[in-house]
Amino acid sequence: MSFDFMTPNKTKNSTVGNYAIVETSGTQFWLEADRYYDIDRINANVDETVTLDKVLLINDQKGFAIGKPYIKGASVQLKVMAHKRGPKIIVYKMRPKKKTRTKNGHRQELTRVMVTSISNGEKPKKATTSAKPNTKKPSTAVKSSKVEKTPE
């Protein structure tokens, strides 16, 4: 029995690269680098860069990093591409035999963003050009085996 329906938009042989699970506007999103996503409206202008700090999980070449609840120092950089509105959803309420009918429509405000980078907060290690020799002198302190007693 195969559960292929649980992984939409993924083929069996596809490999997933770097991704992060972030929280924004009360929902969690699976974000991959260099992809577009429509999320709830963000208060930012078009072509601005937005940083999301509430990162729950990161998967990169080194492996998984899971936060408790968030990963310290991790961030996802987003570029705002456009502001738009979602499809209209019709809400129709009716009470039978009472001639009571209401019809309302709703369009969700959305922001289209592109993920530019995913960072886990680790600073890159500086390459050392030469190893420093051990220049510390050994201590000449002598350990005393006598213990002084305080008068009671």
Swiss-Prot record:
Residues 115-152 are annotated as: Disordered. This protein binds to 23S rRNA in the presence of protein L20. One of its GO terms (cellular component) is ribosome. This is Large ribosomal subunit protein bL21. Part of the 50S ribosomal subunit. Contacts protein L20. It holds the Pfam family Ribosomal_L21p. The keyword Cell inner membrane does not apply. NCBIfam families: L21. GO terms for molecular function: rRNA binding; structural constituent of ribosome. Keywords: Ribonucleoprotein, Ribosomal protein, RNA-binding, rRNA-binding. One of its GO terms (biological process) is translation. Residues 127-143 have a biased composition (Polar residues). Belongs to the bacterial ribosomal protein bL21 family. InterPro entries: bL21-like, bL21-like_sf, Ribosomal_bL21, Ribosomal_bL21_CS.
